[in-house]
Amino acid sequence: MPVKRQITEPNGVFFITFTCHQWKSLINLTKGYNLIYNWFDHLKTKGHFINGYVIMPNHVHALIAFRNSNQPINTIIGNGKRFIAYEIIKRLKELKEDKLLHQLHLSVEAKELERNKKHEVWEDSFDWKECRTNEYMLQKLNYMHDNPCKGKWNLAAAPVDY
Protein backbone atom coordinates (compact mmCIF):
# COMPACT_ATOMS: atom_id res chain seq x y z
CA MET A 1 0.00 0.00 0.00
CA PRO A 2 1.81 3.13 -1.15
CA VAL A 3 1.99 6.05 1.22
CA LYS A 4 1.44 9.50 -0.23
CA ARG A 5 3.02 11.36 2.69
CA GLN A 6 4.89 10.04 5.68
CA ILE A 7 4.06 11.23 9.16
CA THR A 8 7.52 11.83 10.57
CA GLU A 9 6.51 12.74 14.13
CA PRO A 10 6.26 9.89 16.69
CA ASN A 11 3.62 11.85 18.65
CA GLY A 12 0.83 14.22 17.83
CA VAL A 13 -2.85 14.62 17.14
CA PHE A 14 -3.85 13.76 13.60
CA PHE A 15 -7.08 13.96 11.63
CA ILE A 16 -7.06 10.72 9.62
CA THR A 17 -9.33 9.67 6.75
CA PHE A 18 -9.33 6.37 4.91
CA THR A 19 -11.79 5.32 2.24
CA CYS A 20 -13.07 2.06 0.80
CA HIS A 21 -11.93 1.20 -2.71
CA GLN A 22 -13.89 3.13 -5.34
CA TRP A 23 -16.02 4.54 -2.52
CA LYS A 24 -17.90 1.24 -2.24
CA SER A 25 -19.96 0.99 0.97
CA LEU A 26 -18.02 -2.03 2.23
CA ILE A 27 -18.20 -1.04 5.89
CA ASN A 28 -21.98 -0.84 5.76
CA LEU A 29 -22.47 -3.92 3.57
CA THR A 30 -20.44 -6.10 5.95
CA LYS A 31 -21.72 -4.42 9.11
CA GLY A 32 -18.05 -3.74 9.73
CA TYR A 33 -18.47 -0.87 12.16
CA ASN A 34 -17.31 -3.09 15.02
CA LEU A 35 -14.09 -3.79 13.11
CA ILE A 36 -13.23 -0.09 13.35
CA TYR A 37 -14.14 -0.08 17.05
CA ASN A 38 -11.87 -3.10 17.60
CA TRP A 39 -8.99 -1.27 15.91
CA PHE A 40 -9.64 1.79 18.09
CA ASP A 41 -9.57 -0.47 21.18
CA HIS A 42 -6.24 -1.89 20.01
CA LEU A 43 -4.83 1.63 19.59
CA LYS A 44 -5.94 2.50 23.12
CA THR A 45 -4.08 -0.51 24.53
CA LYS A 46 -0.94 0.94 22.94
CA GLY A 47 -1.43 4.27 24.74
CA HIS A 48 -3.04 6.25 21.93
CA PHE A 49 -6.24 8.29 22.34
CA ILE A 50 -9.28 8.38 20.07
CA ASN A 51 -10.50 11.95 20.46
CA GLY A 52 -13.34 11.68 17.96
CA TYR A 53 -14.44 9.73 14.93
CA VAL A 54 -17.21 9.03 12.48
CA ILE A 55 -17.60 5.72 10.70
CA MET A 56 -19.44 6.24 7.44
CA PRO A 57 -20.69 3.48 5.09
CA ASN A 58 -17.54 3.78 2.94
CA HIS A 59 -14.97 5.80 4.87
CA VAL A 60 -13.67 6.62 8.32
CA HIS A 61 -12.63 9.95 9.81
CA ALA A 62 -10.80 9.87 13.14
CA LEU A 63 -9.01 12.34 15.36
CA ILE A 64 -6.27 10.30 17.01
CA ALA A 65 -3.62 11.37 19.50
CA PHE A 66 -0.61 9.11 18.98
CA ARG A 67 1.65 8.89 22.02
CA ASN A 68 5.14 7.44 22.38
CA SER A 69 4.79 5.15 19.43
CA ASN A 70 7.57 2.66 18.79
CA GLN A 71 6.29 2.27 15.20
CA PRO A 72 5.85 4.94 12.55
CA ILE A 73 2.28 6.25 12.58
CA ASN A 74 1.91 5.34 8.89
CA THR A 75 2.71 1.72 9.80
CA ILE A 76 0.17 1.73 12.63
CA ILE A 77 -2.56 2.96 10.29
CA GLY A 78 -1.50 0.61 7.49
CA ASN A 79 -1.63 -2.36 9.85
CA GLY A 80 -5.08 -1.31 11.04
CA LYS A 81 -6.35 -1.04 7.48
CA ARG A 82 -4.95 -4.52 6.69
CA PHE A 83 -6.63 -6.05 9.74
CA ILE A 84 -9.97 -4.44 8.90
CA ALA A 85 -9.64 -5.40 5.19
CA TYR A 86 -9.01 -9.04 6.09
CA GLU A 87 -12.17 -9.13 8.19
CA ILE A 88 -14.24 -7.30 5.54
CA ILE A 89 -13.19 -9.87 2.92
CA LYS A 90 -14.04 -12.70 5.31
CA ARG A 91 -17.53 -11.24 5.79
CA LEU A 92 -18.02 -10.69 2.06
CA LYS A 93 -17.25 -14.39 1.54
CA GLU A 94 -19.75 -15.33 4.24
CA LEU A 95 -22.34 -13.11 2.53
CA LYS A 96 -21.53 -14.82 -0.78
CA GLU A 97 -20.80 -11.47 -2.44
CA ASP A 98 -18.90 -13.25 -5.23
CA LYS A 99 -19.37 -10.55 -7.86
CA LEU A 100 -18.08 -7.84 -5.51
CA LEU A 101 -15.17 -10.03 -4.39
CA HIS A 102 -14.27 -10.56 -8.06
CA GLN A 103 -14.36 -6.78 -8.67
CA LEU A 104 -12.12 -6.19 -5.65
CA HIS A 105 -9.74 -8.87 -6.91
CA LEU A 106 -9.55 -7.35 -10.40
CA SER A 107 -8.59 -4.01 -8.82
CA VAL A 108 -5.36 -5.37 -7.32
CA GLU A 109 -2.28 -4.16 -9.20
CA ALA A 110 0.08 -6.75 -10.71
CA LYS A 111 2.96 -6.11 -8.29
CA GLU A 112 0.56 -6.41 -5.34
CA LEU A 113 -0.71 -9.73 -6.76
CA GLU A 114 2.90 -10.93 -6.78
CA ARG A 115 3.00 -10.18 -3.04
CA ASN A 116 -0.10 -12.38 -2.65
CA LYS A 117 -2.59 -9.54 -2.18
CA LYS A 118 -5.97 -10.85 -3.30
CA HIS A 119 -8.44 -7.96 -2.92
CA GLU A 120 -8.37 -4.15 -2.94
CA VAL A 121 -10.53 -3.03 0.00
CA TRP A 122 -9.18 0.50 0.57
CA GLU A 123 -8.08 3.39 -1.56
CA ASP A 124 -4.30 3.67 -1.54
CA SER A 125 -2.79 5.27 1.51
CA PHE A 126 -4.86 7.61 3.69
CA ASP A 127 -5.27 11.33 4.16
CA TRP A 128 -4.02 13.10 7.27
CA LYS A 129 -3.63 16.52 8.74
CA GLU A 130 -1.78 17.34 11.92
CA CYS A 131 -3.89 19.22 14.46
CA ARG A 132 -1.67 21.76 16.20
CA THR A 133 -4.31 24.01 17.77
CA ASN A 134 -7.47 23.46 19.78
CA GLU A 135 -9.40 25.52 17.22
CA TYR A 136 -8.30 23.22 14.39
CA MET A 137 -9.19 20.11 16.41
CA LEU A 138 -12.63 21.55 17.14
CA GLN A 139 -13.11 22.32 13.44
CA LYS A 140 -12.28 18.70 12.55
CA LEU A 141 -14.52 17.32 15.32
CA ASN A 142 -17.42 19.41 14.06
CA TYR A 143 -16.74 18.30 10.48
CA MET A 144 -16.76 14.62 11.52
CA HIS A 145 -19.88 14.90 13.60
CA ASP A 146 -21.77 16.79 10.89
CA ASN A 147 -20.64 14.43 8.09
CA PRO A 148 -23.55 11.94 8.38
CA CYS A 149 -26.09 14.77 8.44
CA LYS A 150 -25.07 16.62 5.30
CA GLY A 151 -24.65 16.31 1.56
CA LYS A 152 -25.53 13.07 -0.11
CA TRP A 153 -25.55 11.14 3.14
CA ASN A 154 -28.41 12.52 5.23
CA LEU A 155 -28.09 9.49 7.50
CA ALA A 156 -29.37 11.39 10.53
CA ALA A 157 -31.10 14.67 11.28
CA ALA A 158 -28.55 15.58 13.96
CA PRO A 159 -25.08 14.27 14.88
CA VAL A 160 -26.37 12.87 18.16
CA ASP A 161 -28.76 10.63 16.18
CA TYR A 162 -26.01 8.89 14.19
Where are these regions (language model features)?
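Short catalytic/metal-binding and nucleic-acid-binding patches
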Residues: 1-162
